[in-house]
Structure formats: structure tokens, C-alpha cells
Swiss-Prot record:
Together with GSO2, receptor-like serine/threonine-kinase required during the development of the epidermal surface in embryos and cotyledons. In coordination with GSO2, regulates root growth through control of cell division and cell fate specification. Controls seedling root growth by modulating sucrose response after germination. Receptor of the peptide hormones CIF1 and CIF2 required for contiguous Casparian strip diffusion barrier formation in roots. One of its GO terms (cellular component) is Casparian strip. Residues 898-1249 are cytoplasmic. The modification Phosphotyrosine is found at Y1027, Y1071, Y1129, Y1136. Its EC number is 2.7.11.1. The gene is GSO1. This is LRR receptor-like serine/threonine-protein kinase GSO1. It catalyses: L-seryl-[protein] + ATP = O-phospho-L-seryl-[protein] + ADP + H(+); L-threonyl-[protein] + ATP = O-phospho-L-threonyl-[protein] + ADP + H(+). Glycans are attached at residues 77, 117, 213, 228, 248, 298, 309, 334, 369, 393, 406, 454, 537, 553, 558, 565, 693, 708, 779, 822. Its main location: membrane.
């Protein structure tokens, strides 16, 4: 009965309204709205009530109706319901709607313009969705709206000027979108607005002065944009403003003194702009100010004395400016409330004043990256509220006081890179809240105190590079939260404490480069989270404990250079290895099959052990393997066929084993192979011709085997080969003429074989031969080719123990580079010229016909008799032949001279310029430039001049310290880059230069720019290098060029592209340093030399060019100009050594990596006069939050969390590359490994989303 009554009442109420159309309209509209909203089928449907069976829609989830009895929908609150789908235009039909909240869902698509029909709307909340498109300008008609919050979406385009019509607006929140364009000056008409939130967009242009009219404004934040211009003084009129945040923009000029008139201001952040000038004293008048952050600008002068009187100030952050002076003794004289004082990187000098102890409320003190000297004052340890103390990168000295025990709230103690010495006080045990202890690169000595184990909150300990001695305290095992223990490069002795196995959170354990002994404790097997185990360069011994098999998360292990033995099987529990190094130990037994389970393993080093058995076939499963070193073991059997699947192999070293069988023909399928070392084994049979398909081979060492047959002509295919060692085999037959094609050979050893025939004259074509030419202990006959004397770099020549005849060519004696010469035990004769006297007699023994210094003097009479014995007829014949030969050569030289002179003048013409239209002629047009095979066809001088309009400026695409670069589009459709070298000499006539450039031209790598050819004109002083053209310019252009044509490109240079470029750069440098023999030092790595092809792949240019030019210039040439164009990239040691090394290249590469991530130039003004990019990155990387966030180029934002992590990892690698000491920098190969690790794990974060 009761339900029936209720139903009748409900019907009467509705019929009494007389408004069935209105009811049906709102009901129908709600049902239509629902059609565009999608709920998660895995969860309870929050809109299950929204259906036509339930016409009481006022009770539906999120629906609110008015209380007038008309049942009109006035509010829809669907926030946080996990909705997907889109916003339906039907929302615009709720005529009486006052409040619409669709925030915190996953809605996509545009904001419908139909929402502008909601003329009664007072609040519109669409924030935290995935909405796209532009903000509809029609929203400017919502004149009753008070709160408009549509941020945290994917919205693009400009902020509509029509929003200035919303005169009742109190809150406008458009943060965290992708909005562009200026802040509309029309927003200055919003006189009632209280909150204007525009941060984290791409807004640009100046801040409109009209915003000073928004008199009710209490919050204005436009941080994380691209705003420029000056801060308008009119903002000083905002007397009600409490929060002003303009951080991370490009604002310039001085800070207006009028900002000191905002009497209610509590928070002011202008950090990370380009502001300059003095800090206005008027800011001290802001009596309510609690936070002042002016860090990372170009501010100068001293900190105003008045700041220390601001009684309400809690946070003062002035880091990374160009301030001067020292900390005043008046600090905190009238302000004991200061909690955060951050003055890092402000060029402070002098000592830390004892008066700092007056800041009794101080929680964070950061004075790092300055020039502070003296000791840490005892009074500093009276700041008992301190949680963070950063004093690193100064020149502090003295000891660490035991009074540090007073700082019982301390969580971060960072003192690295100072000159602190003495013992680490045992009183540190009182710091029970300490989480991070960084003391590395100081002069601490003595033992690490046992009491450190009482600091039970410690997560990271880094004491690398000190003089700590004694044993590692077992008490460290009590640190249950520890994830980093880095004690490398100290003087620690004794065994590894078994108690370290209790540190179950350890990720990195690095105890390398000490004097540790004993065995590895079995308790290390409990370190289940361990990722890196570095124990190399110690004296550890014994078997590996079986428990290590439990370390399934290891990615890097290095136990090299110890005395360990037994089996390595306990290390094979992980299938996540990236690098595995146990070289130089005494490991025995067979190589475990399980090593093949780490499919991302890049480098496997097992050399110099006592491993036995066969090479595991399972290694063929490691498709990422690039280096395999099993040298100096006792391995037997054949090389397993499965290794043919490791297509990325670049280095194979199996030297000094007992491997047998023929050399596998399938090795020829490893197209990336650059180094093959199979020396001192038991390989037999002839060389497979397939092996010579490995055209990237740089080192081929097969000596000490039983290989036979002849050396095939196909060896000439190995044009990149630097080292060829076939010593101590059974090769026979003659030396192939194709050997002369190995023009990059640095070392050639063919001794102790059975080679016959004459030494081919083509051997003289090996102009890069330097280390050795050893043909000893063979059966070579005939004369020594005089062409050997042209090998101007050769240091060792051994032709001993052959059957050579004739004289020793005088040109050999003229070889200035030759240090070792041995032609003993041949059948040589004649008189040695005086040039040979610099070698000992042993070099010529066993040649009965030889005489002269350093051998016995020639018998003049016997010599004359022998000459007479030739007969007068012979002498006449020989003289006649010599005379005719000399005349013939003279005629040939004269003819060639006139021909070249004729061709030259036909090429350059006779006008005032070298490149007139008359320069083309039938003969000249067919004279090609030198080229290295990279071009489609011969490139002619005239082609280049025509394509560039005689090197006109309109075709110039770049310039630098070495010259200008032009783009040349040739008639054959090919595009090349032409570099005009600014050098006064005719470089191409310099044989040394010509040889070096030809060598560089033969270098091929996917991340190096190909040098295609060169030419010069002596009369015009022009030297041209022809390079492969890179369509997308340099990474410098993309990061720093302000031309409008690049604006769209900047948006395309996303994090994925930048990371790929960073890896490509590192791979190019690694190739130069580790895969070229001899290694090539680039000398001028910078972002403008990192070029991008059409696929945005990185190619390093100008490699080797600086060295070639500086070594081939006259004494008046200032070679340092090669570094003048690279300021900001130069390693610090170059300033005093003036010597470029691989480690100085690594430093320059580190700077480029920082540039790629931060988007800043190495000399960016944000660093200040006394701080460089390295210290700036280091300063911000070591702190969390906004300071770290500013390291990432704003153009990359927003990034996903794991992308930000990857960016920070790249910066950490860059910091390692830019260590002050070259010895502490990684090799380019190690840096490349680290970057590849970041790149290969870049998608891991997607799985967590």
C-alpha cells in the first residue's frame, strides 16, 4: 500500500508542474551525455543509475537539481570516476547548469564549443584529463563564470583573448598543457580574478603590464614557460598578491624595485631566468615574505645586508648567480626563523663565519660550489635542526669535528671534493637519521670507524678517492637500508666482511682498487637486489661461494685482476648481465652454459684464467654480444657455429688457447667484426676466403697456429685492416700483390713461415705502416724493394733469415722513423752507406758480401779489382744505361710539369678570381678531385664551383674555427658538403697531410661523417674537403638556433630522438678510440660537429682534422685556434698540458651530453662567470624536486617519469665523463656501454604505467 501511495504522489507532483517537456529534456540530455562517456568494465559502473528505467534523475550519481520544484539540473559532478570517452556537445543543453566538474578522468577529444551555451555556469572544471585541441574562444561568452580550471590536459594553441571578457572570473587555471603564444593583455581586464595559474606551458613573449590592473590577484604563477622580456614594474601595484612564481622562463633585465611594494607577498620565485643586475634592497621591505628564490640567474653584487633582518623569511635561495663577497658576520642577527639557506654556486669566498650558528632554525644549509676556504667552524655544529648540509666543491681543509654528533637530525652530509683530512670521527655514530654520506675526493685517512654501523638510516655511502686504511668495518652490515657502498680507490686491507650480506637493499657495491684479500663471503648471496658488484684490482682469492647463484639481478660484475679460482658457475644466476668481466684470475673448470641466458650481455671478458673445455654453444643466444674475450685459457675444441648468430660481434679474442680445427668460414658472415684474434692455438688448414668478407676488420691476428696454403689475393678486400699478424704458421707461396691494397696497415707480421718469391714492390704502398714490417724467417729471394724506403712512419723493419740478394737500398738508411733494422742472414752484398752506421753490426750479420760501417771497412783494393773485373765494356754499358735513364726521367718530369701547369691554368682561368666562367674546358672538366669511393661518380672542381656559385655566401651552411662549409647540389643529383679550410699553406702539396687525409677518408662508421675527397688551389690559397652531406644540420642547430625555420623542428626533437643521438655520438667516439689503430683523438668534439642525417641519426664530423692540420702547419701557425672555437668543451687539463687525449675527448663528449639534455649552451649565461656547465649540472642533479627538474630542456616537457629518470641517468654519465681528473673519467667505450644501458631500458617505464 505504501509504495502505491508514493507512486501516486510522485505522479501528482509531476503532473502538477505542468512542465513535462522540461523534465524529458533534462532526462534525455543526461542519457545522451552518457553515450559519450565510457566506464571501466573491470570496476563497478559509477553511472549504472543513469538509465531510462530510473526516471528520478535527480538522484543519479553526480547529478544535483534545483530546489524550486522544477527539477532542473544545476550541477554535474563526475570528478574522479575513471571515465573515458569524450565530452559530448549535449552538455551545452543544460540551460540552468551552474557547476560542471569532469576533472580527474581520462577524457579525450576537444572541448566542445557548445559549452559556451551554459550562460548560467559559474564553475567549469575539466582539469586532469587528456583533452586535445585548442581552448574554444566561445568560452569568453560565459560571463557568469567565476572559476575556470581546464589545465593538466593536452591542449594546444593560444590563450583566447576573449577570456578577458569574463569579468566575474575569480580563478583561471590553465597549467600543464601545451599552450603557446603570448599571455593576452586582455587578461588585465579581469579585475576580480584572484588566482591566475599558467605554469608549465610553452607561453612566450613578455608578461603584459596590464596584469598590474588585477588588483584582487593573490596568486600569479607562470613558471615553466618560455616567457621573455623584462618583469613589468606594474606588478608592484598588486598589493594583495601573496604568491608570485615566474621561475624557469627566459626573463631578462633587472628585478624591478617596485616588487618591494607588494606588502602581502609571501612567496617570490624568479629562479632559472636570465635576470641581471643587483638584487634590489627593496625586497627586504616585504615583511610577510617567507620564501625568496632568485637562483640560477645572472645577478651580481653582494647579498643585501638588509636580507638578514627579514624576520619572517624561512627560505632564502640565491644559488647559481654571479654574486660576490663573503658571508657577513651579521647573518641571522635579527632573523632566527630562517630554515633554508641555499647559496651554492654564488662565487662566495672567504671562510664560513662562526656567526652562522645564530641561524638556530636552519634545516638546510647549502654553501657548495663556491670558493670557501678554511676549516668547517665548530660553531656550525650548534645548528641542531639541520637536516641537510652541503659543503662540497669548495677548498675547505682541516678535519671533521667530533661535534658533528650534535646534528642528530642530519639526513644528508655532502662534503666531497674538498681538502678535508684526518680521521672520520667515531662520533658520527650519533647521526641516526643520516641517509646520505658523501665524502669522496678528499684526503681523509685512518680507519673507517666501527661506529658508522650505528647510523642505521644510511642509504648511500660514497668515500671513493680518499686514503682510508685498515679493514672495512663489519658494523656496516647493520645498515639495513644501504643501497650504495662505494669505497673504491682507498688503501683498505683485510677481508670482505661477511656482515655486508645483511645489507639486503644494496644495489651497488664497489670496493675496487684497494688491497683487499681473502675470499668472497658466502653471505653475499643474500644481496638479492644487487645490480653492480665491482671488486676488481684487489688481492681476493679462493673459490666463489655457491650462494652467489642467488644474485639474479646483477647487470654488471667486475672481479678482474684478483687471485680468485674455482668455477665461475656461481655467477651465472642472473640473466640480466650487460657486462661480465673476470679477467686475470685463476678460474678453472668449464665455462657454464648458463652464461648464454643473458641476452642483453654486451661484453663478456673471461681472459687470462685457466678455463678448460669447449666454448659454450649457448653464447650464440646472446644477440647483443659485441665483445668476446676468452684469451689465455686452456680451451679446446672448435669455435661453435652458433656464434654466427651474434651479428653484433665486433671483437673476438681467443688468443692463447688450445682451439683446433680449421678457421670457420662462417666468420665471414659477422659483418661488424673489427677485431679477430686467434693467435697461439692449434688451428689448421688454409685461410677461408669467406673471412675476407669482413671488410670492417681492423685487427687480424692468427699467429702461432699451423695454418698452411697461400695467402689469398682476397686479402686485399680488407681495406680497413690496421694490424695483420700471421707469424709462426706454415704459409707458403708468394706474397700477393693485393697486399698493397691494405693501405691502412699499421703493423704487418709474416715471420716464421715458408713464403717464397720476391717481396712485392707494392709493399711501398702501405704508407701508414708504422709499428712493424716483419718478414723474417721465410724464403724470400730477390732484391729488397727500394719502395720500402718510402714508408716514412715505419719504426721496425725485420727482413732477416731470408735469401735476399743485392744491396741494402740507401733509402732504407734514410728512414728517420726507423728505430729497429734487421737484415741479417741473407745473401746481401755491397757497401753500406754511412746512414746505416746508426744500427749495430748485429743488424747486418750473416751477409758475407756486405761491408762498411757498422761492419768492417770495405777492402778498397779488392773493391777496385772487383770493379775492374767487371770489364771496361760492362762499365760503359752501365754508364750508358744510367745516362739514358736520367735523360728519360728529365724529359718525363718536364713534360709532366708543363701538362700540370697547362691543366691548372685552364682550371682556374686568368681573371682576377680563380673561379670564372672560363674555368671550364674540355680537359679541366674531366679532371676529378681525389675521392674515396663514397661518391656516385667523380666530383669535378667545376661542378663544385658551379653548384656553389664560386663558394658564394648564400650557399654557406656553417662556419667555425677551421673554415666555412657550403652546400653543393651537383648535376648528378648528389648533394655534398664542401669545407673551405682557412689555412694559408697549400696543404694538398704536403705529402704528410695528403696521406693523413686519405687515411681519414677510408674510415667508415655509421656514426662518422664520410670524407669523400679533397683538393686545393695554391694560387688562391684554397683547400677544400668534400664530405657527405647531412640533411638535418647539427644538434647545435636544433638546440640553440633561433631561426623561425627551425621552430617546428624543435618540437620534433623529442627525448627518444635525443637519447638516440647521444648513443650515436658515443658509438662514433668509441670507434675512433678503440677500433682504429692507432687510435684517433678527435680533439674538437662539440655539438656543432654532431651532424644529423635524414633519419636523425648522429654522425660525428671533423674527426682527426685538428690533429692533421696542427701537425702539418708551419711554425708560424697558431694551432691553438683549433680550440678557440670550442670554448666550453675543452677539458681542464688541456690548459696546462696542451695535449689532447682520448680522455679529453671523453670530457668534450660529456659536455655535449649535458647540452642534449639541458638544451643549454656550455657557455650559457645562467651558469655565471665562475661556474661552468659541469658544476651547474652537478649542483642540480644531486638534489630532488624543482632543482633537478630545471636540468631538463623545457622544450622536452612534459616528460613521463621514467623518461625524466633516463635523462638524469644520461646527465650522471655526462658527469662521470667530465671529472676533473682524466684518470677518473670512463673510457669512451665504458661511457657508450652506460648510454646503451639507458637506451635499451628506455621502454621499461611503459610497463609500469
Amino acid at each position: 500500500m505504501q509504495p502505491l501511495v508514493l507512486l501516486l504522489l510522485f505522479i501528482l507532483c509531476f503532473s502538477g508542474l505542468g512542465q513535462p517537456g522540461i523534465i524529458n529534456n533534462d532526462l534525455q540530455t543526461l542519457l545522451e551525455v552518457k553515450k559519450s562517456l565510457v566506464t571501466n568494465p573491470q570496476e563497478d559502473d559509477p553511472l549504472r543509475q543513469w538509465n531510462s528505467d530510473n526516471i528520478n534523475y535527480c538522484s543519479w550519481t553526480g547529478v544535483t537539481c534545483d530546489n524550486t520544484g522544477l527539477f532542473r539540473v544545476i550541477a554535474l559532478n563526475l570528478t574522479g570516476l575513471g571515465l573515458t570517452g569524450s565530452i559530448s556537445p549535449w552538455f551545452g543543453r543544460f540551460d540552468n547548469l551552474i557547476h560542471l566538474d569532469l576533472s580527474s578522468n581520462n577524457l579525450v577529444g576537444p572541448i566542445p564549443t557548445a559549452l559556451s551555451n551554459l550562460t548560467s555556469l559559474e564553475s567549469l572544471f575539466l582539469f586532469s584529463n587528456q583533452l586535445t585541441g585548442e581552448i574554444p574562444s566561445q568560452l569568453g561568452s560565459l560571463v557568469n563564470i567565476r572559476s575556470l580550471r581546464i589545465g593538466d590536459n593536452e591542449l594546444v594553441g593560444d590563450i583566447p583573448e576573449t577570456l578577458g571578457n569574463l569579468v566575474n572570473l575569480q580563478m583561471l587555471a590553465l597549467a600543464s598543457c601545451r599552450l603557446t603564444g603570448p599571455i593576452p593583455s586582455q587578461l588585465g581586464r579581469l579585475v576580480r580574478v584572484q588566482s591566475l595559474i599558467l605554469q608549465d606551458n610553452y607561453l612566450e613573449g613578455p608578461i603584459p603590464a596590464e596584469l598590474g590592473n588585477c588588483s584582487d590577484l593573490t596568486v600569479f604563477t607562470a613558471a615553466e614557460n618560455m616567457l621573455n622580456g623584462t618583469i613589468p614594474a606594474e606588478l608592484g601595484r598588486l598589493e594583495n598578491l601573496e604568491i608570485l612564481n615566474l621561475a624557469n622562463n627566459s626573463l631578462t633585465g633587472e628585478i624591478p624595485s617596485q616588487l618591494g611594494e607588494m606588502s602581502q607577498l609571501q612567496y617570490l620565485s624568479l629562479m632559472a631566468n636570465q635576470l641581471q643586475g643587483l638584487i634590489p634592497k627593496s625586497l627586504a621591505d616585504l615583511g610577510n615574505l617567507q620564501t625568496l628564490d632568485l637562483s640560477a640567474n645572472n645577478l651580481t653584487g653582494e647579498i643585501p645586508e638588509e636580507f638578514w633582518n627579514m624576520s619572517q623569511l624561512l627560505d632564502l635561495v640565491l644559488a647559481n648567480n654571479h654574486l660576490s663577497g663573503s658571508l657577513p658576520k651579521s647573518i641571522c642577527s635579527n632573523n632566527t626563523n630562517l630554515e633554508q639557506l641555499v647559496l651554492s654556486g654564488t662565487q662566495l669566498s672567504g671562510e664560513i663565519p662562526v656567526e652562522l650558528s645564530k641561524c638556530q632554525s636552519l634545516k638546510q644549509l647549502d654553501l657548495s660550489n663556491n670558493s670557501l676556504a678554511g676549516s668547517i667552524p665548530e660553531a656550525l655544529f650548534e645548528l641542531v635542526e639541520l637536516t641537510d648540509l652541503y659543503l662540497h666543491n669548495n677548498t675547505l681543509e682541516g678535519t671533521l669535528s667530533p661535534s658533528i654528533s650534535n646534528l642528530t637530525n642530519l639526513q644528508w652530509l655532502v662534503l666531497y671534493h674538498n681538502n678535508l683530512e684526518g680521521k672520520l670521527p667515531k662520533e658520527i655514530s650519533a647521526l641516526r637519521k643520516l641517509e646520505v654520506l658523501f665524502l669522496y675526493e678528499n684526503r681523509f685517512s685512518g680507519e673507517i670507524p666501527q661506529e658508522i654501523g650505528n647510523c642505521t638510516s644510511l642509504k648511500m655511502i660514497d668515500m671513493f678517492g680518499n686514503h682510508f686504511e685498515g679493514e672495512i668495518p663489519p658494523s656496516i652490515g647493520r645498515l639495513k637500508e644501504l643501497n650504495l657502498l662505494h669505497l673504491r680507490q682507498n688503501e683498505l686491507v683485510g677481508g670482505l666482511p661477511a656482515s655486508l650480506g645483511n645489507c639486503h637493499q644494496l644495489n651497488i657495491l664497489d670496493l675496487a682498487d684497494n688491497q683487499l684479500s681473502g675470499s668472497i663471503p658466502s653471505s653475499f648471496g643474500f644481496l638479492k637486489g644487487l645490480e653492480q658488484l665491482m671488486l676488481y684490482n684487489n688481492s681476493l682469492q679462493g673459490n666463489l661461494p655457491d650462494s652467489l647463484i642467488s644474485l639474479r639481478n646483477l647487470t654488471r660484475i667486475n672481479l678482474s685482476h684478483n687471485r680468485l679460482n674455482g668455477t665461475i658457475h656461481p655467477l651465472c644466476g642472473s640473466s640480466s648481465y650487460l657486462s661480465f668481466d673476470v679477467t686475470n684470475n685463476g678460474f678453472e673448470d668449464e665455462i657454464p652454459l648458463e652464461l648464454g641466458n643473458s641476452q642483453n650481455l654486451d661484453r663478456l671478458r673471461l681472459g687470462k684464467n685457466q678455463l678448460t673445455g669447449k666454448i659454450p654453444w649457448t653464447l650464440g643466444k646472446i644477440r647483443e654480444l659485441s665483445l668476446l674475450d676468452m684469451s689465455s685459457n686452456a680451451l679446446t675444441g672448435t669455435i661453435p657455429l652458433q656464434l654466427v648468430l651474434c651479428k653484433k660481434l665486433t671483437h673476438i679474442d681467443l688468443n692463447n688457447n688450445f682451439l683446433s680445427g680449421p678457421i670457420p668460414p662462417w666468420l665471414g658472415k659477422l659483418s661488424q667484426l673489427g677485431e679477430l684474434k686467434l693467435s697461439s692455438n692449434q688451428f689448421v688448414e688454409s685461410l677461408p676466403t669467406e673471412l675476407f668478407n669482413c671488410t670492417k676488420l681492423l685487427v687480424l691476428s692468427l699467429d702461432g697456429n699451423s695454418l698452411n696454403g697461400s695467402i689469398p689475393q682476397e686479402i686485399g678486400n680488407l681495406g680497413a685492416l690496421n694490424v695483420l699478424n700471421l707469424d709462426k704458421n706454415q704459409f707458403s707461396g708468394s706474397l700477393p700483390q693485393a697486399m698493397g691494397k691494405l693501405s691502412k696497415l699499421y703493423e704487418l707480421r709474416l715471420s716464421r713461415n715458408s713464403l717464397t718469391g720476391e717481396i712485392p714492390v707494392e709493399i711501398g704502398q702501405l704508407q701508414d705502416l708504422q709499428s712493424a714490417l716483419d718478414l723474417s724467417y721465410n724464403n724470400f729471394t730477390g732484391d729488397i724493394p727500394s719502395t720500402i724506403g718510402t714508408l716514412s712512419k715505419l719504426e721496425t723493419l725485420d727482413l732477416s733469415h731470408n735469401q735476399l740478394t743485392g744491396e741494402v737500398p740507401g733509402s732504407v738508411g734514410d728512414m728517420k722513423s726507423l728505430g729497429y733494422l734487421n737484415v741479417s742472414f741473407n745473401n746481401l752484398g755491397g757497401k753500406l752507406k754511412k746512414q746505416f752506421s746508426r744500427w749495430p753490426a748485429d743488424s747486418f750479420l750473416g751477409n758475407t758480401g756486405l761491408c762498411g760501417s757498422p761492419l768492417s771497412r770495405c777492402n778498397r783494393v779488392r773493391s777496385n779489382n772487383k770493379q775492374q773485373g767487371l770489364s771496361a765494356r760492362s762499365v760503359v754499358i752501365i754508364s750508358a744505361i744510367s745516362a739514358l735513364t736520367a735523360i728519360g726521367l728529365m724529359i718525363l718530369v718536364i713534360a709532366l710539369f708543363f701538362k700540370q701547369r697547362h691543366d691548372f691554368f685552364k682550371k682556374v682561368g686568368h681573371g682576377s678570381t680563380a673561379y670564372t666562367s672560363s674555368s671550364s674546358s674540355s680537359q679541366a672538366t674531366h679532371k676529378p678531385l681525389f675521392r674515396n669511393g663514397a661518391s656516385k661518380s667523380d666530383i669535378r672542381w667545376e661542378d663544385i664551383m658551379e653548384a656553389t656559385h664560386n663558394l658564394s655566401e648564400e650557399f654557406m651552411i656553417g662556419s667555425g674555427g677551421s673554415g666555412k662549409v657550403y652546400k653543393a647540389e651537383l648535376e648528378n643529383g648528389e648533394t655534398v658538403a664542401v669545407k673551405k679550410i682557412l689555412w694559408k699553406d697549400d696543404l694538398m702539396s704536403n705529402k704528410s697531410f695528403s696521406r693523413e687525409v686519405k687515411t681519414l677518408g677510408r674510415i667508415r662508421h655509421r656514426h662518422l661523417v664520410k670524407l669523400m675527397g679533397y683538393c686545393s688551389s695554391k694560387s688562391e690559397g684554397l683547400n677544400l674537403l668534400i664530405y657527405e652531406y647531412m640533411k638535418n644540420g647539427s644538434i647545435w642547430d636544433w638546440l640553440h638556433e633561433d631561426k623561425p625555420v627551425l621552430e617546428k623542428k624543435k618540437k620534433l626533437l623529442d627525448w627518444e630522438a635525443r637519447l638516440r643521438i647521444a648513443v650515436g655520438l658515443a658509438q662514433g667516439v668509441e670507434y675512433l678510440h678503440h677500433d682504429c689503430v692507432p687510435p684517433i683523438v678527435h680533439r674538437d668534439i662539440k655539438s656543432s660537429n654532431v651532424l644529423l642525417d635524414s633519419n636523425m641519426e648522429a654522425h660525428l664530423g671533423d674527426f682527426g682534422l685538428a690533429k692533421v692540420l696542427t701537425e702539418n702547419c708551419d711554425t708560424n701557425t697558431d694551432s691553438n685556434t683549433w680550440f678557440a672555437c670550442s670554448y666550453g668543451y675543452i677539458a681542464p687539463e688541456y690548459a696546462y698540458s696542451l695535449k689532447a687525449t682520448e680522455k679529453s675527448d671523453v670530457y668534450s663528449m660529456g659536455i655535449v651530453l649535458m647540452e642534449i639534455v639541458t638544451g643549454k649552451m656550455p657557455t650559457d649565461s645562467v651558469f655565471g662567470a665562475e661556474m661552468d656547465m659541469v658544476r651547474w649540472v652537478e649542483t642540480h642533479l644531486e638534489v630532488a624536486g624543482s632543482a633537478r627538474d630545471k636540468l631538463i630542456d623545457p622544450k622536452l616537457k612534459p616528460l613521463l617519469p621514467f623518461e625524466e629518470d633516463a635523462a638524469c641517468q644520461v646527465l650522471e654519465i655526462a658527469l662521470q665523463c667530465t671529472k676533473t681528473s682524466p684518470q677518473e673519467r670512463p673510457s669512451s667505450r665504458q661511457a657508450c656501454d652506460s648510454l646503451l644501458h639507458v637506451y635499451n631500458n628506455r621502454t621499461a617505464g611503459y610497463k609500469k604505467l
